[in-house]
Amino acid sequence: MEALAKSLGVNIKTDSPIKKILVNQLDEAYGIRANGENHYCDYVLSGADYHHTETLLDEDFRQYSEAYWEAKTFAPSSLLFYVGFNKKLKNVNHHTLFFDVDFGLHAQDIYDNAKWPEDPLFYASFPSITDESSAPNGKEAGIFLIPLAPGLEDTPELRETYFNKIMTRFETLTSQKVCDDILFKESYCVNDFIKDYNSYKGNAYGMANTLLQTAFLRPKLKSKKVKKLFFTGQL
């Protein structure tokens, strides 16, 4: 994508977090401010989180209040673990969903009563099973994912607790010991989605696709208050 964009004349600037969307007296977006420098343009097209994009505008130019966003239903966040194992694992596939506990209870903890699930369902991916280049010879690369409600407390202690929960079950369900063969482990959760993507409450997928958040009931792609401002992100 980068090569294609550059071939079409796109100038990509990295390490340039946007601090403000510039709006003129005609209520037109005419640029952005990043790293203390203004960059001018004919249109502003934001692929960032919609709520975050609006915080880059002066309050009078924002279409939706904090109460509006608070009332919306968002897709789950996730707790992810990226794990390297010092051996090839048995009884696993490239993609596996572990539904060995009550799906309904986990769903309630995401959508009805937001909290950390007592017994979470989880997903595991081992790309090195089908792409040998994704792990060294004789090793295994694994990704584990637990769906979570957005906006939950996120601490290193909670992450470790849930890693131990799912790994205990994983060992039982696949009839093997793996925890003593972990070479590398990195986690990613609510706070990281907020820090890296400015994602509202750390959600992973944007607004949920509920009946009352479908089609014209979703936030508009074109700003009603600022001309030449369009949204594509987290919708």
What is the meaning of each model-derived region?
Residues 45, 83, 144, 170, ...:
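Hydrophobic, well-ordered secondary-structure elements that form the walls
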Residues 5-18:
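A conserved beta-strand/loop element that lines the FAD pocket in flavoprotein oxidoreductases
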Residues 86-191:
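C-terminal segments that line or cap access tunnels to active or ligand-binding sites in enzymes
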Residues 123, 176-235:
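A glycine-rich dinucleotide-binding beta-alpha-beta segment and adjacent secondary-structure elements
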Residues 4-8, 47, 56, 165, ...:
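Generic, well-ordered alpha-helical scaffold segments in large soluble proteins
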